[in-house]
């Protein structure tokens, strides 16, 4: 054998040995080989790894891949080997050391197929978390052992609740100074209102952290050998036995409060065995009544295998989650809800949701979650939105940037296909007549805008191609062309969001661009109800136009002030029902520009209560014009206000700088809500208008000698102060060369 051949053989033997070690990492027998895609439903898990930025979730995912034998070596997010973490495969992700887009992979863990989506932690990329959680059955919430529950944790928690996703909590970075699972536990209970309890106790503090106490099984676990591959069981250390017993009792009490079986045993003074506790944890986790809290350090290779075991033990398989769709009845055309079958066969037609689009080497890559039936290569599927017919030419499973060809995907699987021209959130089926609609994901509204243009005019074609692709892939990245200023405007979730796309245009399309000064995405809303009675009548020699509407425009409450609502509250047939779509169409068109600074109108409810029509002249265009002219009249007569995005800001700084930082935030009109101090660092949480937070990164660095950092996420829209509204309007008029109407009035009086 040649030297190269001997080297390859040795390398292969070493990989095989490592795989065997990984299989025995949790003292379980290796699974038998099963063909992927036909595994029983109870041996499938679809999970996401979610967290606040810099909590270590990508490192956690990297360890999962390694221990499951998916990769042969581990790399760090900010590694010195210039390789980077497997799931951060974009060049920009590796350069910046952050996750920008969600990435999918799958592993085999002792006979269970785990589909994993690693999601970004930065708030600017929150839509990636939204579309991941929409199609997942469970999640691992990663918390930092030092930081505990942080600002983005609140957002992730709301997203988990929105899609009813059960989760377990992994407290990471237990090797860091000041790390403790108790801070995370307190945050879960008192900040996020979860029924949570520890199932692990750390052994050793800070840099001496070297294992965990498994409170359910009643023993200690140590992670030894190269990469922590060997998991050694031992007795619980003497100095932890009393605390372990107390925490175990606390665990049982928290489960007994929400589980009938364990509750009865607790009331009857019966002690549950290990298996009964495991089963009770699973029952309560699946119904989102309990959150088990685990501990470990992904970077130091401790606790991850035990966490993967908990994913299999406690998180639901696809058959334990009820997934619904709406279809139209054949007789009346009314919508009705149906429950999708999780059976992994073709008894029922395929139903799948396209939840993510991505431009790949071979064209558009469309990620699917299969909810019912099976999808095979060569199948014809129909889009429920418009009935268009598409043939599935290639079917793959993703592992970060790599893919594996498959022939069939079954209910519960996550797969991808090429050449499917569609939009994110569309539902497809093999039954042309079924036309099911799965509930789509929540898409937050952009809060910041910038002008953008290519540096070189010759790059105009690539500039348009890049914008077209990125706006199709990311529904929170939007563009429009300002005819007045003759410039393209892009909008997104934050400065970083837009900067990343600008850099991608340069790296992926060889089109360097210039970004303008950031501007706030204001909204315009009514300050008080406005009653209207408007008649539209137009006679031009031919067919005339007529429409009359009466009703009220109400401002919506603060929790709904980003939408526009329309309702028919008429009695009788003064306005025929078939004309209301035209009124709605007119409303949808005119709310694009409000009366103050031509920002989008939001937070209003237009209620039509009465009116009249003409048998001939009340055409669709007549009713559209009736609505639009009524709104224009309201622009003159009603009390309109500006709404601005309010951001939740979390600043972490050395305690000696806390006073200066609080002062600086207050000067930016921030309302301080919480301050906390731990191990020499202070955390300041506040709410501040987005318009007042531009440039704060530089100021914070200056105030804290470069040691402070802050994160910011959208909280809500709220009315500006009258002074701020006057200032914004004056700046807008100056920018567009429009005279102040109040000044004209003053001159006339003189």
Swiss-Prot record:
Q: In which pathway does it act?
A: Protein biosynthesis; polypeptide chain elongation
GO CC terms: mitochondrion
Q: Name one GO biological process term.
A: mitochondrial translational elongation
Q: Where in the cell is it found?
A: Mitochondrion
**Where in the numbering of this chain does the tr-type G domain appear?**
42-319
Transit peptide (residue range): 1-24
EC nos: 3.6.5.-
Please list the GO terms describing molecular function.
GTP binding; GTPase activity; translation elongation factor activity
**Pfam families named among the record's database cross-references:** EFG_C (PF00679), EFG_III (PF14492), EFG_IV (PF03764), GTP_EFTU (PF00009), GTP_EFTU_D2 (PF03144)
Alphabetically ordered keywords of this record? Elongation factor, GTP-binding, Hydrolase, Mitochondrion, Nucleotide-binding, Protein biosynthesis, Transit peptide
| Recorded catalytic activity of this chain's protein | GTP + H2O = GDP + phosphate + H(+)
- Family matches, as SUPFAM superfamilies: EF-G C-terminal domain-like (SSF54980), P-loop containing nucleoside triphosphate hydrolases (SSF52540), Ribosomal protein S5 domain 2-like (SSF54211), Translation proteins (SSF50447)
| Residues reported in the UniProt entry to bind GTP | 51-58, 118-122, 172-175
Q: Would you identify the family this protein belongs to, as annotated?
A: Belongs to the TRAFAC class translation factor GTPase superfamily. Classic translation factor GTPase family. EF-G/EF-2 subfamily.
Q: What does this protein do?
A: Mitochondrial GTPase that catalyzes the GTP-dependent ribosomal translocation step during translation elongation. During this step, the ribosome changes from the pre-translocational (PRE) to the post-translocational (POST) state as the newly formed A-site-bound peptidyl-tRNA and P-site-bound deacylated tRNA move to the P and E sites, respectively. Catalyzes the coordinated movement of the two tRNA molecules, the mRNA and conformational changes in the ribosome.
The name this protein carries in UniProt is Elongation factor G, mitochondrial
Q: Which gene encodes it?
A: gfm-1
């Amino acid at each position: 054998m040649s030297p190269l051949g001997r080297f390859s053989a040795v390398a292969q033997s070493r990989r095989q040995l490592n795989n065997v070690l990984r299989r025995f990492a949790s003292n379980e027998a290796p699974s038998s080989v099963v063909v992927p895609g036909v595994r029983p439903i109870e041996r499938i898990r679809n999970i996401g790894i979610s967290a606040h930025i810099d909590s270590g979730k990508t490192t956690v995912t990297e360890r999962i891949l390694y221990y499951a034998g998916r990769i042969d070596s581990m790399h760090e997010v900010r590694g010195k080997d210039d390789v980077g973490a497997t799931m951060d495969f974009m060049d920009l992700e590796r350069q910046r050391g952050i996750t920008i887009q969600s990435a999918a992979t799958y592993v085999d863990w002792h006979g269970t197929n785990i589909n994993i989506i690693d999601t970004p932690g930065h708030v600017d990329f929150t839509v990636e978390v939204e579309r991941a959680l929409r199609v997942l059955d469970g999640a691992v919430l990663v918390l930092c052992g030092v930081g505990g529950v942080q600002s983005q944790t609140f957002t992730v928690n709301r997203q988990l609740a929105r899609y009813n996703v059960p989760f377990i909590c992994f407290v990471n970075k237990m090797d860091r100074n000041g790390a403790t699972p108790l801070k995370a536990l307190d945050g879960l209970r008192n900040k996020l209102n979860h029924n949570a309890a520890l199932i692990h106790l750390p052994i050793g503090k800070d840099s001496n952290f070297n294992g965990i106490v498994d409170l359910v099984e009643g023993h200690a676990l140590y992670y030894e050998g190269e990469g922590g591959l060997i998991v050694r069981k031992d007795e619980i250390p003497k100095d932890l036995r009393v605390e372990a017993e107390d925490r175990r009792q606390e665990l049982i009490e928290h489960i007994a409060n929400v589980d009938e079986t364990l509750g009865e045993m607790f009331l009857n003074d019966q002690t549950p065995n290990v298996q009964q506790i495991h089963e009770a944890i699973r029952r309560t986790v699946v119904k989102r009544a309990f959150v088990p809290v685990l501990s470990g350090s992904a970077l130091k290779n401790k606790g991850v295998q035990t966490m993967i075991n908990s994913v299999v033990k406690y998180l639901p398989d696809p058959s334990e989650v009820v997934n619904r769709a709406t279809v139209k009845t054949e007789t009346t055309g009314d919508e009705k809800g149906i429950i999708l079958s999780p059976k992994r066969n073709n008894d029922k037609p395929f139903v799948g949701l396209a939840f993510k689009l991505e431009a790949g080497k071979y064209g558009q890559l469309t990620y699917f979650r299969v909810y019912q039936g099976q999808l095979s290569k060569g199948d014809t599927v129909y889009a429920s939105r418009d009935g268009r017919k598409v043939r599935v030419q290639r079917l793959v499973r993703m592992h970060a940037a790599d893919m594996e060809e498959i022939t069939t995907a079954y209910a519960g699987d996550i797969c991808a296909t090429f050449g499917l021209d569609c939009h994110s959130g569309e539902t497809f089926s093999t039954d042309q007549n079924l036309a099911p609609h799965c509930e789509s994901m929540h898409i937050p509204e952009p809060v910041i805008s910038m002008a953008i243009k290519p540096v070189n005019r010759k790059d105009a074609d690539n500039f348009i191609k890049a914008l077209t692709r990125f706006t199709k892939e990311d529904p929170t990245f939007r563009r429009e062309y300002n005819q007045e200023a003759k410039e393209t405007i892009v909008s997104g979730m934050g400065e970083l969001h837009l900067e990343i796309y600008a850099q991608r245009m340069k790296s992926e399309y060889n089109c360097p661009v210039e970004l303008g000064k950031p501007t706030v995405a204001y909204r315009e809303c009514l300050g008080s109800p406005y009653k209207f009675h408007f008649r539209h009548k137009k006679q031009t020699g031919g067919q005339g136009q007529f429409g009359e509407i009466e009703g009220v425009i109400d401002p919506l409450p603060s929790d709904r002030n980003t939408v526009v609502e329309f309702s028919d509250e008429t009695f009788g047939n003064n306005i025929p029902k078939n004309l209301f779509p035209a009124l709605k169409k007119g409303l949808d068109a005119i709310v694009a520009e409000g009366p103050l600074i031509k920002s989008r109108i939001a937070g209003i409810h237009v209620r039509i209560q009465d009116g009249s029509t003409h048998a001939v002249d009340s055409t669709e265009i007549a009713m559209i014009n009736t609505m639009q002219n009524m709104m224009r009249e309201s622009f003159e007569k009603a009390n309109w206000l500006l709404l601005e995005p309010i951001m939740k800001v979390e600043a972490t700084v050395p305690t000696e700088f806390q006073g200066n930082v609080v002062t600086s935030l207050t000067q930016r009109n921030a309302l301080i809500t919480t301050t906390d101090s731990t191990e020499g660092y202070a955390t300041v949480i506040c709410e501040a208008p987005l318009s007042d937070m531009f440039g704060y990164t530089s100021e914070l660095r200056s105030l804290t000698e470069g040691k402070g950092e802050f994160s910011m996420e959208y909280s809500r829209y709220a009315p500006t102060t009258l002074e701020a509204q006057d200032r914004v309007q004056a700046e807008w008029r100056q920018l567009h060369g429009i005279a102040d109407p109040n000044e004209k009035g003053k001159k006339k009086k003189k």
